[in-house]
């Protein structure tokens, strides 16, 4: 159990516009945009045509705001990119709206390629134009789809078009990219789509959130991850078809899903600072998808889907792309059993209960009761087996005294005794081992469930965070600077449970073993999600009731041997009846 704790402890036509709600920079009229070369047939060289890329850099930009029921997005005409995205129904630990795009000064999305003259083209440096009459603020109706196209023209035949599609009740944003007549300006056979933005911190416990942060790429059924828990910079490169790339923090993610074949991807992470607790600490991730572009093609058109929102299981599962694989549900060697338990048992049951019960603390209590009922046959058999083993101690001592110098005879006599009593020496351990995958799955389940985030119960303000009932003026190693109420009660009930089960030593120095495991859990659980501590508290209380009313934990030696003699008599009577 201590090894398990060591490895598992953590140390979401366009509608008629309404009045704008915030100021945006003054729109740039088409006349103010830089002039582009008039035609490919004017005799200009590719080198002259590329001057338009440079002239576009210094032009002013225009910003637009798109509002849906779930989020507010800010886009810029410079680069036709997303500048900010703020969720409406989620808050950070200090009450501010959660921003999933907030630290990208140049925008989060761009196209890039190498020209035939060895120049790097980045669309975030280009000024795109909008359709005439496009307002500064756009609102998406409940059942509408808003399409917002941006166009950059080198001349009448060569252009870049980037179009976004927004819906009101979904965190998905459609993206369509079209390049026309640019084949003479693109070297090689590929272009890159780059997502260049981290996901900012949103939780009070920055250390735990930093452990969950990372960038991911999924290809051929294999998940590649970049985490900055050891190195300041890490990079991974993939080739061939890539199903998706993503970056996440504890509860939120930005995912880029290509709708067309790819030729590879790169995920890069950079860490600023050393300790997540420091205010200046930050993690920045860059995702790059490589797209094929045949040099003989007059036009390139690609479609993508962006998911920028909470990591709710059913929203991610709807894509059928194994997006939930980036959620850590336990150690890899147990993933084959822990992940199905979580995704197909715990999450469906927990979600079902949450539809009918308004408070998630009550959901956790009822969930604990259901799990306890499901495990009752295993735990009852375990406790009864241990009780029988304790009652057999006099018989075992007598066998050892009868054959002091013959271990083989001892073993034969002990096996015969076990067979007569109906006891398996592993009967006390095996049911507990069978429960281990369930316990591991629950250990990771509660910290990863966004439904309980910032939901309170009793004195706990947030079931996804520790429930401090006393803040200490100092920090204790391995424990922290506070006392968690549910954890304290959990440890006390575990001591009572141990004493009732009769499994602990009660004489001399060995009596301390009754308290060692509860003390260690009290230390380890002090900084975990209070929802997890609440679950184990209720589970311990149910175990106490189980031991009191439903399980034999004390079996008298004489009573047990009388049961054995009774079994022998019944077997003898059956043999006589057969004769």
Place the predicted regions along the sequence by residue.
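Helix-loop-helix
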Residues: 1-25, 75, 175-180, 194-212, ...
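Juxtamembrane extramembrane loops of integral membrane proteins
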Residues: 8-94, 100-104, 150, 568-579
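Soluble non-transmembrane domains of integral membrane proteins
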Residues: 58-327
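Generic detector of short, locally flexible boundary/turn motifs and exposed helical patches
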Residues: 36-43, 48-52, 138-144, 156, ...
């Amino acid at each position: 159990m201590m090894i398990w704790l060591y490895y598992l402890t953590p140390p979401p036509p366009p509608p008629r516009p309404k009045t704008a709600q915030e100021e945006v920079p003054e729109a740039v009229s088409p006349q103010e945009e830089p002039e582009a070369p008039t035609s490919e047939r004017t005799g200009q060289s590719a080198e002259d045509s590329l001057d338009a890329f440079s002239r576009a850099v210094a032009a002013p930009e225009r910003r637009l705001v798109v509002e849906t029921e779930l989020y507010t997005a800010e886009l810029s005409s410079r680069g036709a990119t997303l500048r900010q995205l703020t969720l409406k129904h989620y808050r950070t630990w200090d009450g501010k709206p959660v921003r999933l795009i907030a630290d990208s000064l140049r925008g989060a999305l761009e196209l890039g390629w190498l020209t035939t003259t060895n120049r790097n083209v980045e669309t975030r440096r280009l000024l795109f134009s909008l359709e005439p009459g496009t307002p500064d603020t756009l609102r998406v109706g409940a059942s509408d789809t808003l399409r917002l196209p941006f166009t950059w023209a080198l001349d009448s035949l060569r252009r870049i078009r980037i179009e976004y599609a927004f819906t009101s009740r979904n965190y998905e944003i459609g993206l369509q990219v079209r390049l026309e007549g640019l084949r003479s300006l693109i070297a090689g056979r590929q272009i890159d789509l780059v997502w260049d933005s981290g996901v900012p911190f949103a939780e009070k416990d920055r250390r735990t959130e930093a452990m969950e942060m990372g960038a991911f790429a999924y290809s051929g059924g294999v998940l590649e991850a970049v985490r900055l828990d050891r190195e300041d910079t890490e990079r991974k490169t993939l080739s061939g078809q890539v199903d998706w790339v993503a970056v996440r923090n504890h509860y939120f993610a930005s995912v880029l899903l290509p709708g067309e074949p790819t030729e590879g991807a790169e995920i890069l992470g950079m860490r600023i600072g050393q300790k997540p607790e420091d205010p200046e600490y930050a993690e920045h991730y860059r995702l790059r998808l490589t797209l094929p572009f045949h040099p003989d093609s007059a036009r390139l058109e690609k479609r993508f889907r962006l998911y920028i929102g909470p990591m709710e299981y059913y929203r991610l599962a709807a894509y059928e792309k194994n997006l939930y694989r980036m959620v850590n549900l336990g150690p890899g060697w147990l993933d084959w059993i822990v992940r199905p338990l979580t995704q197909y048992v715990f999450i469906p049951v927990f979600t079902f209960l949450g539809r009918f019960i308004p408070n998630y603390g009550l959901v956790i209590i009822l969930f604990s009761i259901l799990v306890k009922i499901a495990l009752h046959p295993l735990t009852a058999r375990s406790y009864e087996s241990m009780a029988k083993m304790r009652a057999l101690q006099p018989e075992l001592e007598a066998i050892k005294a009868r054959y002091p110098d013959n271990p083989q005879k001892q073993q034969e006599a002990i096996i015969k005794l076990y067979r007569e009593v109906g006891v398996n020496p592993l009967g006390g351990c095996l049911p507990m081992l069978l429960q281990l995958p369930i316990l591991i799955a629950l250990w990771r389940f509660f910290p990863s469930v966004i439904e309980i985030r910032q939901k309170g119960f009793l004195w706990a303000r947030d079931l996804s965070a520790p429930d401090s009932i006393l803040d200490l003026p100092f920090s204790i190693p391995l424990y922290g600077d506070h006392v968690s109420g549910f954890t304290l009660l959990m440890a006390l009930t575990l001591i009572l449970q141990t004493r009732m089960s009769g499994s602990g030593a009660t004489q001399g120095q060995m009596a301390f073993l009754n308290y060692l495991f509860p003390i260690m859990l009290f230390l380890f659980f002090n900084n975990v999600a209070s929802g997890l501590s609440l679950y184990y508290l209720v589970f311990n209380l149910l175990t106490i009731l189980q031991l009191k009313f439903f399980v034999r934990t004390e079996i008298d030696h004489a009573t047990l041997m009388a049961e054995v003699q009774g079994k022998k008599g019944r077997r003898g009577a059956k043999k006589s009846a057969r004769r």
